[in-house]
């Protein structure tokens, strides 16, 4: 192999390793068998969720995972591999891919990494079942508002009972 090709591949490894280090969530899939239309829809959905999606050679992924400290990911880089990276939302790649896999049976989740910890296919699917960040924040807000609401109802009930007694 020429030195130019080796240098280019080394640069790719560095770039992917940096993406892996920076990502809060990585999902690796086998997209073999998807139609062009399905692939386009999947990529659009991921892009709208702020997720980067790339098909990368396994040899480059393996070396990048080693450099990123995610050695255990090497076991899932068998067969065609596509990787979804998210730097902001932990749940977004898992949720979009898992929802899409329900309609496109050709898409198979292989595994991934969540905040630097290698995760199995089952863990990625469990993560996908969680609500997104906005959903979790609204749940937290409703839990925090409940005691205040209950106090307000109690004060209102006392005020109404005193009005009725007067």
Curated annotation (Swiss-Prot):
Keywords: Ribonucleoprotein, Ribosomal protein, RNA-binding, rRNA-binding. Pfam families: Ribosomal_L10. GO terms for biological process: translation. GO terms for cellular component: large ribosomal subunit. GO terms for molecular function: large ribosomal subunit rRNA binding; structural constituent of ribosome. Disulfide bonds: none annotated. PANTHER family: 39S RIBOSOMAL PROTEIN L10, MITOCHONDRIAL (PTHR11560). Part of the ribosomal stalk of the 50S ribosomal subunit. The N-terminus interacts with L11 and the large rRNA to form the base of the stalk. The C-terminus forms an elongated spine to which L12 dimers bind in a sequential fashion forming a multimeric L10(L12)X complex. Belongs to the universal ribosomal protein uL10 family. Forms part of the ribosomal stalk, playing a central role in the interaction of the ribosome with GTP-bound translation factors. This is Large ribosomal subunit protein uL10. It comes from Streptococcus equi subsp. zooepidemicus (strain MGCS10565). The gene is rplJ.
């Amino acid at each position: 192999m020429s030195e130019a090709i080796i240098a280019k591949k080394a640069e790719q490894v560095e770039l992917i390793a940096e993406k892996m280090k920076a990502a809060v969530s990585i999902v690796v899939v086998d997209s073999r068998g998807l139609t062009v239309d399905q692939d386009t829809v999947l990529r659009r959905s991921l892009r709208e969720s702020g997720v980067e999606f790339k098909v990368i050679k396994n040899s480059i992924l393996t070396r990048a995972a080693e450099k990123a400290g995610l050695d255990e990911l090497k076991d899932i880089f068998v067969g065609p591999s596509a990787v979804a990276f998210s730097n902001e939302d932990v749940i977004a790649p898992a949720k979009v891919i898992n929802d899409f896999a329900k309609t496109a049976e050709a898409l198979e989740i292989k595994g991934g990494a969540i905040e630097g910890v290698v995760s199995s296919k089952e863990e990625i699917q469990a993560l996908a079942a969680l609500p997104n960040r906005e959903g979790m924040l609204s749940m937290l807000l409703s839990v925090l508002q409940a005691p205040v609401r209950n106090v307000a109802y109690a004060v209102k009930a006392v005020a109404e009972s005193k009005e009725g007694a007067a």
